[in-house]
């Protein structure tokens, strides 16, 4: 469908929605027309929520997860095991692990993977912050819960080499196929993957 059929404002909404992951041309058109024609109140609610979140959400100064405070609830909790640090790629991975309810340590969210072709290196992943956390905390084990993709393998190797302290480093394994994304695993598979993790160092 030619975008000239739509007014400039509708076209702007469609093009904005197309920037979202997995949203193509047809999906963005359907969403835009539904919100503007069938449910303008929902459109206003979504817009206000997004604006408020965009202005107030930031990254936790420790784990780099999204939060409204300087320190997120997990990093600030006295009930979490600070001796175990789980390194993950995204907030979606954190959500998956937390919903499974088996891990009681703390996290570091990379918000990506090392990928030179995409211009993503150690600096973009805030590995300098991770290094300071490792230096300053009494950590006994670092769990690399990173998807087994080419970029994930590169990232896991870099981090394991970066950690100079005498700390146990393990990698989740069972049930995670090569190229698989952690966020898509069911809870039982995720639990098995953690329980069957292998030592790297």
Curated annotation (Swiss-Prot):
Gene designation per UniProt: recR
Zn finger (C4-type) start-end: 60-75
Family as reported in the entry's similarity comment: Belongs to the RecR family.
Keywords attached to this entry: DNA damage, DNA recombination, DNA repair, Metal-binding, Zinc, Zinc-finger
GO molecular function per UniProt: DNA binding; zinc ion binding
InterPro entries named among the record's database cross-references: DNA_Rcmb_RecR, Rcmb_RecR, Rcmb_RecR_Znf, TOPRIM_dom, TOPRIM_RecR
Residue ranges of every copy of the Toprim domain listed in the record: 83-177
Claim: Transport is one of the keywords in the record: no
GO terms of biological process kind: DNA recombination; DNA repair
Family annotation (PANTHER family): RECOMBINATION PROTEIN RECR
Coiled-coil intervals, chain numbering: none
HAMAP family given in the database record: RecR (MF_00017)
Protein name: Recombination protein RecR
Keyword Nuclease in annotation: no
Function: May play a role in DNA repair. It seems to be involved in an RecBC-independent recombinational process of DNA repair. It may act with RecF and RecO.
One Pfam family cited in the UniProt record for this chain: Toprim_4
């Amino acid at each position: 469908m030619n975008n000239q059929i739509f007014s400039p404002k509708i076209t702007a909404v469609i093009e904005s929605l197309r920037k979202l992951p997995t949203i193509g041309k047809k999906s963005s058109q359907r969403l835009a027309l539904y919100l503007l024609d069938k449910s303008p109140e929902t459109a206003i609610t979504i817009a206000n929520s997004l604006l408020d979140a965009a202005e107030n959400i930031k990254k936790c100064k420790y784990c780099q997860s999204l939060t409204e405070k300087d320190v997120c609830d997990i990093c600030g909790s006295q009930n979490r095991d600070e001796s175990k640090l789980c390194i993950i790629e995204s907030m979606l991975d954190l959500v998956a692990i937390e919903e499974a309810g088996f891990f009681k340590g703390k996290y570091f969210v990379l918000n990506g993977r090392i990928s030179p072709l995409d211009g993503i290196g150690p600096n973009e992943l805030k590995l300098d912050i991770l290094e300071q956390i490792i230096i300053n905390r009494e950590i006994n084990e670092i769990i690399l819960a990173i998807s087994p993709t080419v970029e994930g393998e590169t990232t896991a190797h870099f981090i394991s080499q970066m950690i100079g302290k005498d700390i146990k480093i393990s990698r989740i394994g069972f049930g995670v196929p090569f190229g698989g994304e952690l966020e898509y695993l069911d809870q039982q598979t995720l639990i098995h993957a953690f329980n069957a993790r292998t030592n790297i160092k």
